[in-house]
Amino acid sequence: MINLNIKEILKKIDWQDPMWQKIKEEILDLNQRIEDSKEIEALLDGFNGYYIPAGPSGLITRGRDDVLPTGRNFYSLDPYRVPTKSAYEIGKRLAEKLIEKHLNEQKCYPENVAIFWMASDIMWADGEGMAQIMHLIGVKPAWFGNGRIKDFEIIPLKELGRPRIDVTIRVSGIIRDNFPNCIELIDEAIQKVASLDEPLEKNFIKKHTLEIMNKNKGDFRAGTIRIYCSMPGTYQAGTQLAVYASAWKEEKDLAKVFLYWNGYAYGKDIWGEAKHKEFAEILKSVDVTYNKVVSDEYDLFGCCCYFGTHGGMTAAARHLSKKEVKAYYGDTRDPENVEVRDLADEIRRVVRTKLLNPKWIKSMKKHGYKGAGDISERIGRVYGWEATTQEVDDWIFDEIAKTFVMNEENKQFFKENNPWALEEITRRLLEAWERGLWNPAEDIKKALRKVYLEIEGWLEDNIGEVKSEFQGGSIDVITVEEVEYWKKKMQEVVKI
């Protein structure tokens, strides 16, 4: 039902005005569709094998009110309609904002931007990121009259007004498996741009293609591979597994894991072929790594894939290039005011607005065991970003320790609802300190040690006799060199 306060406001409006009459109709229509949402009923119907009516999916915060009523069997979108014309305009602005930021800070154009291309870009944002990729390399979509993509067109250098920026794309497994046409379109565009008769200082795609060709006996196709993912049938970037297992000592260890897991090429005539050497070569030319946020409903702490892929790619590019590689984050939450900021600034923004926000913490505590576990997972991802990129400020770890470990009220909440979550939080903080990723004050160090011993006592007192398998926590540092199976599997990657 419509909120009572809103009803009172509506009573004061002159509904005889035609403009307000139309708005009223829209409000009442939205309210009716919200009331018609039957999610639980649809779930039960599905369990019983009944028909569930179909409906579109999307973010209502992006104006997609057609997703109402919910509880329908939702479908995605026509993959041959992305990027849409409106998304292309947003993508163009994103590309120019990224280039402008790098020019202002580094006094030069970025030659190669490594992009984590997520399915949310296509399914929620109609291909803004895809459009950004196209504009960076200097091409634009060509549409049929019905809005479907016909092909791409080359933007002349004179019209573009700058060099063509190279891209290295780690595409998500969902895009790979559900939107192969989008991958093939970008791949064809990259090959076309690499073959243009243009000066190398104006076409970084061509420049890097020739460099790779010189190391691959003149193989043009090897030189133009820019889209990579994990092995067919697999997902995730691998880096997060190494981080969570503490299976690394230095940045190079995470770089090797990322390279091994993600060195499989995808494109028009190549699908899932192992191309680790070519992947390593193109990563050497990366100047910037990049991802973007499209909605506050999801952020870079929402899944380990964010730091595993974007963070892993940053670690790999820095290790292989032996140079400073910037990490940027785009923001299209407000499509009218797109931004590109440092990854460190995006981390600060999300930490302040969610993780350390008292209102957010209060709302999570309402969910008891699950809420405690979710807090622990997000803190683990903060650690993951620091492990892979070193872009997390010390004050963030300080405040996490003070808020969740040293605060008596919150500590009691974890003790009563999920002491394992507090054990994980404390252990990750201790690991960050021991690895030199964070330099806490002495009082914080002392408190962490004390609380960790308390947690061990809680768990020993309450866990009882364990007769089956049991997973405990520890900080054991194990790398590929120490596990014979891993060592054998990654032998070729280690040589790169």
Language-model segment annotations:
Residues 1-496:
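Ligand/cofactor-recognition surfaces for anionic moieties
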